[in-house]
Design a protein with these regions (language model features):
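Predominantly cytoplasmic-facing regulatory/coupling regions of multi-pass membrane proteins
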Residues: 1-81, 138-240, 266-305
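Membrane-interface alpha-helices at helix entry/exit sites of multi-pass transporters
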Residues: 74-78, 92, 96-97, 107-123, ...
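Transmembrane alpha-helix interface/packing and boundary motifs in multi-pass membrane proteins
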Residues: 84-92, 233-248, 252
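Mid-bilayer segments of alpha-helical transmembrane spans in multi-pass integral membrane proteins
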Residues: 84-94, 122-134
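Transmembrane alpha-helix termini and helix-breaking/packing motifs in multi-pass membrane transporters
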Residues: 131-142, 261
Length: 305
């Protein structure tokens, strides 16, 4: 009962943010977000999406292998594409990750470790975004927000995101807390693990920022990249909050606030976030092909299990 109530609450909060933006800024920002996208932006999204997906899948491979699980890069890329697509079209924005975690764990004969590999991989990505957000926003005070407020916002976002991930019951299994801690040390903190994982996470973040820049230019923003990057980092950080509808909600709200605070206009921030959301969905579309082509294989696997 509590799980069901929390699931509905998350969706309602995300929907509430979008409704509030709709009432405050009108429909034009949403309409413009669809109208300004051209073939050039679509191809850019597909290219950037390929790069970020490969980088993220590679990160997953590193974590999984450190935990003793087999995972080839080609298979990881296909599974990651499918997860991104499901995350984009299904509520909550994490159901695709749940599927790839459970499927990989079952195939490797260790469901708990398969799930932990995905959780740790996602934590690594979020950690880099949080660190980048703190570093960039403190280094570039031209955003217009007081430094104390920035720290409070980032701190709250970080605490909520980490608490949400840590509280997830599917991160646990019957092996107990000691095995989970051991996997964290091996998968993320080991000397031969964290440098590569950090580098891949930083490169993937750069790709997401590049897609945001494409979105900003599509809506006609003439602001320099140095001014846009802090706004984009904070918007990306908001996507980690577990109160969204397929990634929509907090990202658009934060983008409207920070673009407005920077003097670029809340409407431009909202339109940029909408364009980014559409382009991110376009970038995940290869995952739909993976889902269709691999469906018969998955059905046979489920019968075998």
């Amino acid at each position: 009962m509590k799980k069901s109530m929390w699931a509905w609450a998350k969706l309602l909060i995300g929907a509430g943010i979008l409704v509030a933006l709709f009432l405050q800024l009108g429909t034009q920002s949403f309409v413009d977000g669809l109208r300004v996208i051209t073939v050039g932006e679509i191809f850019a999204a597909l290219g950037i999406g390929l790069a970020t997906t490969v980088l993220s899948a590679w990160r997953w491979c590193l974590v999984a292998r450190r935990l003793g699980l087999r995972l080839s890069l080609p298979r990881a890329v296909l599974d990651y594409y499918r997860a991104l697509f499901l995350n984009s079209v299904l509520p909550a924005g994490v159901l695709g990750d749940v599927q790839r975690a459970v499927e990989h764990g079952r195939q490797e004969g260790d469901l708990g470790r398969g799930v932990r590999a995905v959780v740790l991989e996602r934590i690594a990505g979020q950690a880099v975004i949080i660190v980048a957000g703190v570093a960039v926003l403190l280094a570039v005070p031209s955003l217009g927000l007081p430094r104390d407020i920035i720290l409070v916002i980032l701190g709250v976002l970080a605490v909520i995101a980490v608490a949400f991930v840590a509280a997830k019951r599917w991160v646990r299994d019957n092996t107990g807390l000691s095995r989970t801690i051991a996997d964290i040390r091996a998968g993320l903190l080991a000397r031969n693990a964290w440098p590569g994982i950090t580098l891949l996470s930083a490169a993937a973040l750069a790709g997401h920022i590049a897609l945001f820049v494409v979105a900003a230019h599509a809506v006609g923003s003439t602001a320099p990249i140095a001014q846009l990057v802090p706004l984009m980092v904070l918007s990306l950080l908001a996507m980690g909050l577990p109160v969204n509808i397929g990634g929509w909600g907090p990202r658009e709200g934060v983008a409207a606030v920070v673009f407005g605070a920077a003097g670029l206009g809340a409407a431009q921030g909202l339109t940029t976030a909408v364009v980014y959301g559409v382009l991110a969905l376009v970038a995940s579309l290869p995952g739909a092909g993976v889902l269709i082509l691999r469906a018969p294989v998955l059905r046979r696997l489920e019968k075998a299990l």
